[in-house]
Amino acid sequence: MATLVANITLQMTNSIDLVRSTAVRLLVEVENGSRLDGLLDTDPFVDARDRRFLHQLSAGAIKWRDRLDWIINSFSKRPVKSLAPEIRQVLRLGTYQLLWLDRVPERAAVHSSVELAKYLEHSGTGGFVNAILRRVIAEGRNVAYPDVVNNPVAYYATMYSHPRWLVSRWLDRWGAAATEALLQANNEVPPVYVTLADGTADHPLPASFGTVEVEDRPGVFRVTHPEGLFDDPAFLAGWFVQDINASLATRLLAAEPGDQVLDVCAAPGGKSMQLAAVVCSGRVTATDISQQRVQRMRENMLRLQRQQIAVVVEDGERPAAMGPFDRVLADVPCSGTGVLGRHPEARWQKDAEDLRRHSDRQLRILESAFARLRPGGILVYSTCSLEEEENDTVVDAFLARRPDASLEPASVHFPGMAWSARSVQTLPGRDPGDGAYAARIRRLLPGQSRSA
């Protein structure tokens, strides 16, 4: 069956919709552990409209998976999880189009789903899919959900389609209002932000992209009409994509002209480019464990002419002998719970045990990075996680081991900001942009104490 689905795009009949059949294939692969963005990079479509529709279908069905399953199970005698993987995705896609995409005619959504089911199995399966989707049209908007008072975890997890273990911990930490806003933000189409590689406006983007500079984020612009952006000569000459909050870590690091800076786990390289624009005659050493990601960084540095950046393949847990550095940025691998809106499949591919595995590795990387920082220098530890185990807990464990390390409150550098106190923590739904964490740590001079 899986082979059959994989060959849909190669063995088409007139009755099978190419975009929707490809979406089924992608969804099956994502459910088996693949990343959606990697699959979309290899999709066969040249037409921009088809590419956008494929992305919309795939990302939407993934984000809303559990709510879609709840709706389908309300009308099916066979639980969704008991169905063949391909038929499960056909039903999810059909239901998503009927209830979320107003511009898709009901007839087109039902007909394409039925034809796909018949192609994948037989006419009887097509009849089963047709019956379910007809019920969805008639009653899908009136389905009863778990009671928010008696079972808030089940309610929020189902209504906003997130894993229950994650919803439970967020409710405990953030409360109902902030958690609901966070869940809702994760299901919205994430905005596109771009940053100037050198902090100057020598390569302004055409007005058709609708770029607007973000308040309190110098050099960061929101792109309201991003179609065609990545092929535009002005973009290629001086811009890169980066979330509004990605620059918070580099601003907290506060590198200065002439500094020698180490950027650990640097891919895709946006922070390195920001740092290079600041250090001028200094140097940025950007490291990453992945040869493929390092090659992509090198291509971006060449495109944007950032000669003061050296890109090195390196394991952050077992670094080479380099340094000491004036500034170190350790933007460590994490669970990514702050960027679930940009990676819809990630919410279904994680569990609570991932947090422990990440935190152990994060502490090792932090210790290795700090060892290459000169006395008196500054290190910023950052993640795109919302979880305390990966953020303050890691920093506290590190400080307990290193009496020559001192935490400097982030509020000094971001006064008056609700997301800035002991450390930086932005929260989607409460704050613009992705979830981001950053803590500023100074390496004390010999004989200096934390109270000094």
Describe the role of every protein-language-model region.
Residues 1-452:
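S-adenosylmethionine
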